[in-house]
A protein has these predicted regions:
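Metallocofactor- and cofactor-centric catalytic cores in central/energy metabolism, strongly enriched
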Residues: 7-70, 257
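Short, charged/polar "capping" segments at the starts of alpha-helices
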Residues: 13-14, 66-72, 116-118, 137-144, ...
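Short, aromatic/basic amphipathic alpha-helical patches
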Residues: 15-21, 70-76, 122-123, 141-150
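A short, well-structured beta->alpha microelement
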Residues: 21-26, 39-50, 146-168, 175-177
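A glycine-rich, Thr/Ser-enriched phosphate-binding loop motif common to dinucleotide/cofactor-binding enzymes
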Residues: 77-94
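Glycine-rich phosphate/diphosphate-binding loop of Rossmann-like nucleotide-binding domains
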Residues: 100-162
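Rossmann-like adenosine-cofactor binding region
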Residues: 156-211
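Adenosine-phosphate binding glycine-rich loop
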Residues: 188-257
Length: 257
């Protein structure tokens, strides 16, 4: 279970058991549950001890604009792994759209450690050619065998990066070169797309002001809400601008000759 945290100033709200004890509200969502915690400042100060007691060692998501209270030991939830999953889902959705218009899409998938073999299998139906760049040759050899059994074709596996120049799309969940780990899909011209706050549709039950991606990630990782594993972004970001998945797919098709 996880919790969300809101900190506010003002008079004691109805239902607060004591003057400075946080309000804890249990909520059900996506087959799991979490606690919505509202902590009130008195004269600009929080009762850190009572806040820590209310939260315990559970992962916590703070409302946007709220920094962890100074001196408060919180287990802040990290959505980094889920953001990579969301990026991969979004990349697959983009390629699926693009494949309706272009069949000659070649994709380079960079996975040095071999931890994303399952995603490589998703590339085969939507890309004419798939190239896997990895140091985990053995893991991907098994993946290639499965792909051949399922699709009659297998990705080309290599530990060299030269193939990137031949590909219309590069997908790298852990980053590539100067790009940070949240950059997932980009063209050879180094225009790339990534996910960030607000890129997915509102998740039912997400408290106001809480990042929807963080909330979906917590439901998936802490509450086993498996349907969150299939979400894709509604848009991705490039150059500070929002682009729909359809627009990204169109751009890829224009880049491919």
């Amino acid at each position: 279970m996880f919790c969300t945290l809101t900190i506010y100033n003002g008079k004691r709200q109805k239902g607060a058991p004591t003057y400075r004890r946080p309000i804890v509200i249990r909520r059900e969502c996506a087959g799991g549950s979490y606690d919505l915690i509202r902590a009130r400042k008195k004269k600009g100060r929080l009762n850190i001890r009572k806040l820590e007691q209310a939260i315990g060692d559970r992962p916590v998501i703070c409302q946007a604009g709220i920094d962890p209270p100074h001196g408060c030991r919180l287990n802040l939830f990290d959505s980094g792994r889920y953001r990579k999953l969301l990026s991969l889902n979004s990349a697959a959705a983009v390629l699926s759209i693009a494949s309706r218009y272009k069949r000659n899409i070649s994709v380079a998938f960079i996975d040095p450690s071999g931890q994303y073999c399952g995603f490589a299998e998703r590339l085969m139906p939507i890309a004419e050619s798939a190239y896997i760049i990895t140091n985990s040759i053995e893991s991907y050899s098994l993946c290639a065998n499965r792909c051949y059994t399922l699709f009659g074709a297998a990705p080309v596996i290599s530990d060299g990066y030269g193939i990137i120049e031949k590909c219309g799309v590069v997908i790298s969940p852990d980053g590539y070169g100067v790009f940070s780990a949240d950059k997932c899909i980009f063209a050879p011209q180094n225009e790339f797309w990534h996910v960030e706050r607000g890129c997915i549709a509102a998740v039912d039950g997400c408290p106001e002001g809480v990042d929807e991606v963080d909330f979906a990630a917590a439901l998936y990782e802490c509450c086993s809400a498996r349907r969150m594993a299939t979400l894709a972004a509604e848009h991705m970001i490039a150059g500070g601008q929002k682009h729909t998945l359809e627009a990204i797919a169109h751009r890829i098709c224009l880049d491919i000759r």
